[in-house]
Swiss-Prot record:
Keywords for this protein: Coiled coil, Membrane, Transmembrane, Transmembrane helix
Stated name of the protein: UPF0496 protein At5g66675
PANTHER family registered for this protein in UniProt: (RAPE) HYPOTHETICAL PROTEIN, UPF0496 PROTEIN 3-RELATED
Pfam families, alphabetized: DUF677
Species of provenance: Arabidopsis thaliana (Mouse-ear cress)
A GO CC term attached to the entry: membrane
Coiled coil ranges: 314-348
Membrane-spanning parts: 240-260, 263-283
Family: Belongs to the UPF0496 family.
Region annotation (Disordered) ranges: 1-30
Length: 412
């Protein structure tokens, strides 16, 4: 592109050189206002160079290139002609600058405003949270079944009190004194274990999914942390791109001046003596927008990571309390089995019922603990989903469709 523009400029100058006088006005390609036009930005660039050793190195290299070009052009300025060596110097300088920009851009890797990885990650998080909510619902159903068993045991204890006190007048002679109690115990036994094998398979599946999600979120967080540390490098890219375009314009102006108006070469050379390049307002906006985008991604990932971690801990608590409840459930079932097996022995039934009575409050407490933890887990998941959604809604996007894709991921 640079060589094409250069060739066209030289062709135009060659066609008009025969009729040109010393008073010929400068062609449009010659820019003498670059220094004043970007004076504020050049000052900002000076500050950036002082803070960034790599930018200092780039600036020094750029000065060397432009000085070589100026010297080559100045040597033939009085004859209003360009030597072959000067042409090579100009084209070589422009090519080197282009290559430098390409190198920086290649190393920049990706555009953060259209991040497909983040969209996939959000999808995975909300899919996982939905499955975890399903698990919480499964826990609630199990707790409801356990509470039914609790009610049966409670009713059995009431029957036992009545039958033990002799207040139950409906007992026929020759029948088991604790017939009603044993009937309720049979109902409790028939209700079975509310936390069967399918429940624990679901728990393990959801838990493993949470562990995998947490690992992915951890890797993504480290990746974004690295990007935030490299923000200065991204700012450097915008500096390099802008200053390259700036110098390219000035070089073409010098080339045009060398043919059209030799005295202007000196003035342009003086302009180039100013520390060249500028980040400019648009470049400054560019890298700040990038930094904001990366921080926005990090906020989303952090909120998902916290949500996944809290969910894992909630599930750990549910697992612990379910295990405790199963222990109490098995203990109750053993006592019920003993009473039913020894139903003809009133003493054995009384002993079993006394043991059931002593453990009944603990059994009830374990059921409530599981239910409370399932409710807490469900609330935490809902809260985490809301927080992630808020971050997504405030997430900077290069297009409305990008944000729409993220929102669609959690509303389907």
């Amino acid at each position: 592109m640079f060589l094409g523009m250069f060739s066209k400029t030289m062709e135009d100058k060659s066609n008009s050189s025969r009729n040109r006088t010393n008073n010929t006005p400068l062609p449009q390609q010659i820019r003498t206002d670059m220094g004043s036009l970007y004076s504020a930005d050049l000052t900002a660039y000076n500050s950036a160079c002082r803070e960034d050793p790599d930018l200092q190195s780039f600036d020094s290299s750029l000065h060397q290139r432009t000085n070589r070009v100026i010297n080559s052009l100045a040597s033939g300025a009085q004859t209003r002609s360009l030597s072959f060596d000067a042409l090579i110097e100009v084209s070589g300088c422009l090519l080197e600058m282009n290559q430098e920009v390409v190198r920086f851009i290649i190393e920049s890797k990706e555009d953060v405003w259209d991040n497909k990885d983040l969209t996939c990650l959000v999808n995975a998080y909300f899919d996982s949270s939905i499955k975890t909510l399903d698990f919480c619902n499964a826990v609630d159903n199990c707790v409801k079944r356990a509470r039914i068993g609790q009610m049966l045991l409670q009713f059995a204890l009431k029957q036992f009190e009545m039958e033990s006190s002799g207040s139950n007048k409906s007992v026929e002679p020759g029948t088991n004194k604790y017939a009603k109690t044993l009937e309720e115990l049979n109902k409790f036994k028939a209700s079975g274990d509310p936390f069967d094998g399918d429940f624990f398979m679901l728990l393990e599946s959801v838990y493993e999914q949470q562990v995998m999600l947490l690992e992915i979120l951890h890797k993504q967080k480290r990746k974004l942390d690295k990007k935030l540390k490299n923000i200065k490098y991204w700012k450097k890219i915008s500096n390099v791109v802008f200053v390259t375009a700036f110098v390219s314009v000035l070089i073409f102006s010098v080339v045009a001046a060398a043919v059209a108006a030799p005295p202007v070469v000196t003035a342009l050379a003086a302009a180039l003596a100013v520390p060249i390049g500028s980040i400019g307002k648009w470049c400054n906006h560019l890298w700040k927008k990038y930094e904001t985008a990366v921080k926005g991604q990090k906020d989303i990932v952090l909120s998902m990571r916290i949500g996944a971690y809290v969910t894992m801990k909630d599930m750990d608590n549910i697992r612990v309390h379910v295990d405790k409840l199963k222990i109490e459930m098995e203990s109750m079932m053993q006592k019920v089995d003993f009473a039913l097996k020894e139903k003809e022995e009133e003493v054995a039934v009384r002993l079993s019922m006394h043991e059931i009575s002593k453990k009944f409050d603990v059994f009830t407490e374990r059921i409530e603990e599981v239910g409370d933890n399932a409710t807490k887990c469900s609330k935490n998941i809902t809260l985490a989903r809301t927080i992630v959604l808020r971050h997504i809604l405030s997430f900077p996007s290069s297009s409305d469709s990008g944000q729409g894709n993220l929102i669609e991921a959690i509303t389907l």
